[in-house]
C-alpha cells in the first residue's frame, strides 16, 4: 500500500481525487490518501482523504471532515489482478547517471 499525505487546497480538489486514483492504478496497489482539512490565512483545504483500491475504486472517503477510515484490503484479489494485467513487466531497465 502507498500512503500519500498532502495539503491540497479546495480549488484543486478534483486534481487530488484524480491523482489518488491514478497512483493506485499505475502501481496496482491500495492507496491511503490523507489530505488536510480546514483553513489558514492563505487557503481553504478540502479534505477528501480516501482509501482507494488497485483498480482505482474508492473504498472509503472522509469527505470534508477529519475522520478515521477503515477498509479491508484483499491481497489475494490484488495478486490475481496483477497476474491478469502484469503492467510491471513493461518497465525498462535503465540507469540515470549524473
Segments (PLM) and residue ranges:
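Residue-level signal for alpha-helical context at structural boundaries
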Residues: 20, 73-74, 96
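Cysteine/selenocysteine-centered motifs that mediate thiol-based redox chemistry or coordinate metal-sulfur cofactors
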Residues: 79-98
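A short, polar/proline- and glycine-enriched secondary-structure boundary/capping micro-motif
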Residues: 14, 71-72, 92-94
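CN hydrolase (nitrilase-like) catalytic-core segments centered on the catalytic cysteine
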Residues: 1-69
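A short, polar/charged loop-to-alpha-helix boundary motif
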Residues: 67-84
Amino acid at each position: 500500500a502507498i500512503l500519500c499525505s498532502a495539503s491540497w487546497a479546495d480549488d484543486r480538489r478534483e486534481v487530488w481525487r484524480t491523482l489518488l486514483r491514478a497512483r493506485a492504478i499505475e502501481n496496482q496497489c491500495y492507496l491511503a490518501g490523507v489530505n488536510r482539512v480546514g483553513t489558514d490565512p492563505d487557503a481553504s483545504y478540502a479534505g477528501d482523504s480516501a482509501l482507494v483500491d488497485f483498480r482505482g475504486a474508492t473504498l472509503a472517503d472522509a469527505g470534508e471532515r477529519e475522520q478515521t477510515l477503515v477498509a479491508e484490503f484483499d491481497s489475494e484479489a490484488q495478486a490475481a489482478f496483477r497476474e491478469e494485467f502484469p503492467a510491471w513487466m513493461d518497465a525498462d531497465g535503465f540507469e540515470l547517471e549524473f
